[in-house]
Every structure is written in C-alpha cells, then in structure tokens.
Amino acid sequence: MGFNEFLSSIFGNKSTRDMKEIQPWVDKIKAAYPEVAKLDNDGLRAKTEELKEYIRNSASKERAKADELRAGIENVELEDREEVFAQIDKIEKEILEIYEKALDEVLPVAFSIVKESAKRFSENEEIVVTATDFDRKLAATKDFVRIEGDKAIWQNHWNAGGNDTVWNMVHYDVQLFGGVVLHKGKIAEMATGEGKTLVATLPVFLNALTGNGVHVVTVNDYLAKRDSEWMGPLYMFHGLSVDCIDRHQPNSDARRQAYLADITFGTNNEFGFDYLRDNMAISPKDLVQRQHNYAIVDEVDSVLIDDARTPLIISGPVPKGEDQLFDQLRPLVERLVEAQKVLATKYLSEAKKLINSDDKKEVEEGFLALFRSHKALPKNKALIKFLSEQGIKAGMLKTEEIYMEQNNKRMHEATDPLYFVIDEKLNSVDLTDKGVDLITGNSEDPTLFVLPDIAAQLSELENEHGLSDEQKLEKKDALLTNYAIKSERVHTINQLLKAYTMFEKDDEYVVIDGQVKIVDEQTGRIMEGRRYSDGLHQAIEAKEGVKVEAATQTFATITLQNYFRMYHKLSGMTGTAETEAGELWDIYKLDVVVIPTNRPIARKDMNDRVYKTKREKYKAVIEEIEQLVQAGRPVLVGTTSVEISEMLSKMLTMRKIEHNVLNAKLHQKEADIVAKAGLSGTVTIATNMAGRGTDIKLSPEVKAAGGLAIIGTERHESRRVDRQLRGRAGRQGDPGSSVFFVSLEDDLMRLFSSDRIASVMDKLGFQEGEMIEHKMISNSIERAQKKVEENNFGIRKRLLEYDDVMNKQRTVVYTKRRHALMGERIGMDIVNMIWDRCAAAIENNADYEECKLDLLQTLAMEAPFTEEEFRNEKKDKLADKTFDVAMANFKRKTERLAQIANPVIKQVYENQGHMYENILIPITDGKRMYNISCNLKAAYESESKEVVKSFEKSILLHVIDESWKENLRELDELKHSVQNASYEQKDPLLIYKLESVTLFDNMVNKINNQTVSILMRGQIPVAEPTEEQQEAARRVEVRQAAPEQRQDMSKYREQKQDLNDPNQQAAAQQDTREAVKREPIRAEKTVGRNDPCPCGSGKKYKNCHGRNS
C-alpha cells in the first residue's frame, strides 16, 4: 500500500469527504419535497413569494440601520463622513452574510419547488394559475403564456436557440447534489450529458430570491441566448425576471434593464467589458451593472483557465495612429521571407544528400544543414516530412544540443548564415546581421534597422565637455528621437516577419469581407472584432493586402481572473475540471467536486493510433469514417483548425460521403448542424467542440448500431479539450466510442513528444502506412500535454502576478471614480485631497519661500504661518493649521459660486423649467473654461449647491480619467522594459512591483494637485454687465427635457489580449453603434433679424439688441 493510499484509508479520499459533506443536504431536500408536491399550482408560486419575504426580513434591521445612516449623511461634517461610510460598508457586508444563512435555511424547500415545477411542466402540456401583473406583462411578449380572464395559462413548449423545445426534464438526485455544490461556491464537475444546464436552475433560483441578481456566465453568445430561452420559463413561472445581455447593445438602457433582472445570462467577455465601460462612464445614467453578487460560470475551466491568459482591453485612438510603416516596409519583409525560403530549401536539399553519405564528417555537415533549415522555416512541409523519417529528427536534436552547450555559446555559428531565426516554442523571430544587410540594401544609412545603444550614447553625451546645458539637451532630444524612430521601424519589421512566418490563413485567422478575423483555438469560432496586440494585427492586415487599421491606446483593462474574483460568491460547472483543480484552488480558491453520474458511462475509449506522416493519418481517418457510416453510426470528427476541416471535407466529397462542416466560417448554421449530428450515418466535421455538442441526441436505431463515434484528428495542447470531444459520446449511459488519430508531424508531437515515439517506431521497423497503437504511446502523448499545460499555467500565473499589481491600483482609482460619479462620497474624497495637498506642501519643502509658492500654486492661498513658525513648529501642527484655512477658503469659494449661479438658475427654471432638463454653467480656473452640465431642477431646489457638486464631479472625473490613462500607458511601457532585468539576473516582476509603486504615487499626487488647484480657483466668469451682456446672460445653454442621451462609447474598441506570446493576441470588439452627439440647445427661441426685438422696445431686432450681432 502506497503512502497516499494509506492516508486515504484513514481520512477517506476527496470524493468520499465531498459526499459526506453534501449528501445530508440532498436528504433534507428529499424530506421537504413531499410537502411541496402537495401544493396546487397557485400554492407553489405563493411558496416562492413566502421564501422571498423570509429572506428580505432576515436582514430588515440591518437595512433600516444603513438607510438611516445614509439619510443623515448630509447633516454630518465633511471631515467626519468617512467614519459613517465605513459603518455603512460594514453593514452591507453583514447583510450579505445574513442572506447566505437565510438561503441555507430555505434551500431544501426552494430546491423542492424547482424540482416540482420541472415535473409539472414535463407532465402537463398546460399549467393554469391565477394571473398576476407579471404574467400579464409576459403574455404581451412571450408565446408560451396567454391570459384568459383572471387565469394565466403556461404551456410546456417554447423556442430555445432557434429550435422548438418541449420541456421533458426532472431533476435526478445527482443533480440535486450538483445544485448544492454550486450554491456552496464550488465547481461541479459533471460528465457530458448529465444535465449541467438543468442543475444550474437550482442554485440560480435559490440565489435569485434575494433580489441582488444572479449572473449565469457562458462561453459564447449562442449558449447565453439559448440557455436564457430554454430555462427562462421555469424561473418566470415563479415571478423571477430573466434577461440576456448579449441580446442588447452595449451601453444601452436595454442592457441596463438586463442587469436589473433577477437572473442575467451573458458571455464572460461582455460581463467584463461592461465593467470596464462602467468605469469610463461620465454619468450615473451610463452605468449598467449593479453589485457583483453571485455568478455561475458554465464551462468554468474554459472561462477561468483558457480565457484567463487574455486580458480584456478597451482602447481608443491615439494621436497620429494612422502613421504606420506596415505597408511601406512590407516589400522588404517579402523579399526577406522569399530569400529565406530559397535558403531553407537549399539547406534541406544539402542535408538529404549529405546525411546518406558514408563519411562521418559529411553526415555531421548534413545534420547542421538540416538544423539550419529547421531554424529558417520550421513549418516547411517538406522539412516536416523528412524529419518523420527514421533517425532523422534524433540526429538533428543531437546537433542542436552541440550548439546549445554553455548557454548557446556556439549557436551563432549555426544561425549566422540565415536571414532570420525562428523559435517556435518561444513564439519569437530574430533578425540576423545578414538579414539586416539584405533589407538595408543600398541605403545611405547602414544602421537603418539597427537599434543604437542609447544608454551608452547618453552616458557619452553627459561626459562630453565644452557643451552648454542647452546644447546637451538638444543633442539628447535628437538621440532619443532617432532611437524612437528606429525602434518603431525594427518593431514593425519584427511583427511583419511574425505575420509571414508564424501565422497562417485559415488556421490562426481567416479573411472575410476584407477584414482579418481571429479564430478561437479552443472553440473554432470567429472571435468577432477581436484584434492581436502590439501591431501584430496590423502586420497580418498588411500581409493579406487589406486595409491596415489605425493604432490604439489602452484606456481600461482587466483580466477575467480579477474580474470574477470581485463576486461575493462564485461557482462553476464543467465536464473537465479535475485536471486543473490545483490551479482553480490556487487562484480562485474554488474547490472542484466530482459529481457521480446518474448511469454508468458505456463509451469505449480506444488508445491513440499513431502514424508517421499527416498524409497517412488523414487517409486512415477517411477509411475509418467510411466503415462507421456503413455500420449506420453517426460520426463526429474533431479538428483543430479550419484548414484541416476543409481538407477533410474535400477528401470526403471525393469519396462521395455526405457530411456537414462546423467551423469559424460556417458558425451561423451551428444549431441545425448540431441537431442533426446524431442521425444514423451522419458525418459532422467540427473545429473544436468546446461548449458545442450539448444537443446531440441519439435515436434507438443509432444506439443499437453502437452509438455516436468520436474521431479526433489531432491531440490538442490541453487534455481538457480532448476530454470535451470524447465526452460528446456516451451521454446518459448511451453507447459510443472515441479514438484519436495522431501523426509525428502534428504540432504537439513535433514540438514536445515525437523524438521518443519516432525512435520506438524506427526500432520496430514501421513502414509507411503502418500505425502504432499502445497504452504506452497514449501515456507518452499525455505527458507531452501535461508539459504544455504546466507551461501555460506558468504563463497565466505570471500574468496574474503582473495584473495583481495593477489590480490594487485599479481598485483604488475605480473606487475614487465611483465616489465622484455617484456624488455621495465626493465631498469626503475632496477633503482628503485637500489634507494630502496641505501635508505635502509642508513635508516636501524645506525652504519657506518654496512652501509659500507651492501653497499659492495649488491651493490659491497665502501661507497661514510666518517663516519663524515654519522653522520651529512641528510639521503636523503646520499641516493642521494650513488645512483649516484651506477648508475655510474652499467653503467660502463654493458658497460664492452657488450665489452667482443661483439668480440665473432661478430665472431659467421659473420661466422655462418645464421645457428643459439640464443647464450648462461656464466655470473657469483662470487657465481654461469648463462647461459644467447640471440638472436644472436639482440646482433650483438646492439653491445652486448642485452646481458646486456637478463642478466637483466633472473636474474629478476628468482628472482621474486622464491620469489613469497615462498611468496605464506607463505601466505597459514598464512591463516591456523590465524584461531586460533578467539579463542582470534580477526578477523582472520584482522590479515591476517596485517601479509601479512609484508610478502610482506620482499619479495620486498628480490627481490631488490638479483637482485641488482647479477647485480652489474655480469661479463663474463675471464682469460689470452691459445692456447686451444682460441680454446674453438670459440666453443660458440648457439641455432639452427629453430622455438624456447615453455616453458615446463608439470611439472605443474592446480587446482581448492573449499573453501566451508577449505581443500576442489582443482582440478588439468595436461597438459600432451610432451615438447621437450630445449638443446643448438654447433656452430661448432664435430671433430673426426682422422680428420684433424681445426687449419690448417695438423696434426690429436688427435695429435694437441685434445691432451688433
């Protein structure tokens, strides 16, 4: 007995412990069920209302206390409000904990209600209940509810995902078990076909009873829309509102309403992007999300692991974003790539001749030539075929080891003859001196594509004597400008090289309607609007000859990891999470619980079939398909790229075998193709099946013939994606089979595993067309997959460590921004800013005159102490004294501002208030004019105090947004520059953490300085009014009393950036919605030149007040 088995025998294994914890809950549900089953239809719905009331009342005292504190906040001095808000925050947290206890108490009854409702819908075509207002509202838009008199009739069939669906599901005991796991904030791993979607109805219903909102997160919009339509009626029957954010435009009222629903479905990206958009909003009306309460993530491994490498980014235009060099430098790169192709072919030809020689030296030269050909173009098909021959790859790897010895000391000898060097594993392309010479050509500047040693040049300049400071500064600027230009040129060349050598059309991307669109490697779907980052997308656009889009700058960013960690409670479900249980616990503190299957799995999983070449493999795949079709079985063929799908489709067409293709180019037909995939003799080719096969149902004839047959044409980098493909067969105890066809030329095998298997095949003397099938081989492939998974986990963990630094900063900035936006805590924040500024003025200035100047520049005040006091008093005391005077000045100025604005506000509101909603007030700080928009009614009722609040809010939002945008750019530059620290044996992450603190402190100081300076100087510009000016004062700019326009987000684009490669995959989703420009309109009617003058003089306007117009 091993040590682990010994421990398990004492403490029990993980599954046993989970069962012990969850099973008592299932027993409680089963005990409560008979009482619920006795209720009539109206009684069942009334029970739901009873539970809602019980949960609401459980925290009624705490809610009343929080409301009381909020109501009295205006009577509390600004300096003392922080303590009150801290109390409110504490009570809010207590309410959430009380709700959790109440939910646990009602869980058995709530789960019983859902189960009984599902049972009644499955047994009755119609359910009759007493109509409520909610029923009547639904009946106007939904065809599964109709009203007859005082009765509402609910049907048990409706449209879901484009298909008519009849409800025929009731929860099994194992699904109740899964529901408890999800409610407890854990991950439920359930085999495919065990009804994950139905399981989710239990915790979703229960947690929606609080009214705080439940988010159901899916991997794509098809599933989000389908699940909201499929499960929605079950929730709606009990008066719970359901919506899907993907049905509505971003930043719209409809999307805001979707978030206010009790249950909100949507895709992970859209939830994340909405959060970022909310933190760019300029009015509370622009916000769509409410608090992050509870989320259930479907395909949780795909969302929290696969997508976690890709930060969400909202970017906007940058100055001179159109000035790019991609089209200009493309011909040079094409010449470079063509020259490299000729060279790679020449070396491969040499290698083939020399390797077969009897002379040992010639054989060594042959393998060196082969290694050079591999470094030149590793994806060359002729090279890949030659490497699959007996002993060839092993010989090349030995040669590589020789040149890699002593930290790549001799590697340059092997790579110098090439124009550039490709490293597939590191996703990198490096230009050699020979390559630089080729593209420089006859240029006057031989260093056109060579980056200068800027540090050495600046050091030389500093030590240069005989130059004035001004001359040194001029030379320094010239050096830095030259470096920036060359850096951009070299970067563009590198990105173009990557585009030409490492990214293939119809594999990583497709070109549709003159646009380059990325294909998701996990799902095979087009990632609409996403873009690769760092100029790579523009490079591919230049390569494909389509329009090169303008460059962009990051305005807001977050990783999905940090977004989902904001939820009060998070849980998830998937068919394949156990292999990633460690990562899910490390990063999210989510425990994986494996749910037992309702019926034993009857699928037969066969060992991998390994061939030497892709050609042999695909031939064998077609033959296997032909045999299965003849046996009357449906076949699902999983591929890893669009290109392979199309090639197999052509091969099947030549054999006259009917089939359907499901990939990035044909995803519109998805629902139809998936629905037919279980019919006898049907062949379906699908590019990656993650979250796709949920609808493959089998007929009795198909089950008798052996069920659905799964054929994988290649092993994926992740074992989980392979398990998802296998899991499409053998649902609910159905028969089925799965097998993977692998060749030594596949990317995974080529990069990580094939040398060992190739040597086995060589020793056993395998000929072309023969295949090897053994458990040992399948295990070897699995080890290669583990290697890749570990590497990817490292990347994700590293990304998270970098983003954690930014996340702390983002939390502080977004909290401060939300305070400004909502206005509730803005006064408290401004008081703190003024205090910080006063303390900094005393702390940072050793000289009295400098301190005086600092106070004058930022706080617009004289120093309230003498030079002697400055030298002798304690700094704390001086800061307190300065703060008291600054606050007195600030209050006096804001009161004066309100006094000046009030007569105008009063006049406009009393004369034309019924016509207009907002008014624009011009305020200046002496440097620039700010037009402050303010609600007219609120300004009138508060005697213009609302004008002051709007001024504070507008300035703070403006300063925070500009400073944060600049900080993001600096952090981005810092992340790239610290990577060089590894050459000095330092940890780049550590340097990044230290430097980012300095950047953040500088940003906070800048926000404080700018905000306080503008607020302290802010005033409405007034002068002694002339008759004309008095007339103009009456023409105040106001907004019409129509519904206020929402913020225009159309100039921003959303991106997901894949950090698998430092440059890689930023993607961008353009919100193409046309937004109406928010133009203020005039309060008065426009007076024509020949109309009577409005002053009442009786003269024409052109001869009276219009004389000077």
From Swiss-Prot:
Main location: membrane
Protein EC: 7.4.2.8
Subcellular location: Cell inner membrane; Cytoplasm
Cofactor note: May bind 1 zinc ion per subunit.
Binding residue positions for ATP: 175, 193-197, 695
Membrane topology qualifier: Peripheral membrane protein
Any GO BP annotation: protein targeting
Record-stated family: Belongs to the SecA family.
Quaternary structure annotation from Swiss-Prot or TrEMBL: Monomer and homodimer. Part of the essential Sec protein translocation apparatus which comprises SecA, SecYEG and auxiliary proteins SecDF. Other proteins may also be involved.
Record protein name field: Protein translocase subunit SecA
Source organism phylogeny: Bacteria, Pseudomonadati, Bacteroidota, Bacteroidia, Bacteroidales
